Regions:
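Short, well-formed alpha-helical segments that are part of the catalytic scaffolds
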Residues: 10-28
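A conserved acidic beta->alpha catalytic loop
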Residues: 25, 36-44
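Short beta-strand/loop segment that forms part of the nucleotide-sugar
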Residues: 30-39, 57-59
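Glycine-rich, basic loop-to-helix element that forms the pyrophosphate-binding segment
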Residues: 59-76
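Short aromatic/hydrophobic "clamp" motif used to bind/position activated sugar donors
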Residues: 81
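The conserved acidic donor/metal-binding loop of glycosyltransferases
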Residues: 85-89
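Conserved donor NDP-sugar-binding/catalytic core segment of glycosyltransferases
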Residues: 93-125
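A recurrent flexible, glycine/aromatic-enriched loop bordering the glycosyltransferase active site
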Residues: 131-147
Length: 148
């Protein structure tokens, strides 16, 4: 498996400042689909010009987080998708660690990250733990979810 096996989907709504930091935390070799819940052509041009690996889809209006993610997921052509919030930042090793976990458990449905919320930002990283094979959870934080 390689980085070409993952597409990152980010639903946003007028989040230009936040999403810029998020996109800077993603290596430029990863494909990213940003579904912007507006019709802001200036936003689309700015994001796609600054981040060549990002395809911005304008929803035309605020369809909400779930519907915007579904639009993005329909465009994914890779084996895996990562739904990521526009205010999250990835640890540099996060996606590589995810691929390692995915290889060990190829029939997973969803993998969520370990989260470091001690700072003023949320730092996401994926590591194997004793709870990795957890089959049921009471809550999954939705700011980063890997889907198979």
């Amino acid at each position: 498996m390689s980085i070409k096996d993952i597409t990152i989907v980010i639903a946003s709504f007028k989040s230009e400042k936040k999403i810029s930091q998020c996109l800077k935390s993603i290596h430029s070799d990863y494909n990213v689909i940003n579904v912007e819940n507006s019709d802001d052509q200036i936003y689309k041009k700015k994001i796609e010009n600054e981040f060549k690996n990002v395809r911005c889809i304008l929803a035309g209006k605020n369809l909400g987080y779930g519907k915007a993610n579904n639009i993005g997921l329909k465009e994914v052509k890779t084996k895996y998708a990562l739904i990521l919030n526009p205010d999250a930042e990835l640890n540099p090793k996060a996606l590589g660690n995810f691929l390692t976990l995915a290889q060990k458990t190829p029939d997973f449905a969803l993998i969520g990250p370990n989260v470091d919320e001690n700072k003023k930002k949320t730092n996401l990283h994926f590591e194997e733990s004793e709870n990795f094979l957890l089959l049921k959870a009471n809550i999954v934080k939705g700011y980063a979810m890997f889907l198979n």
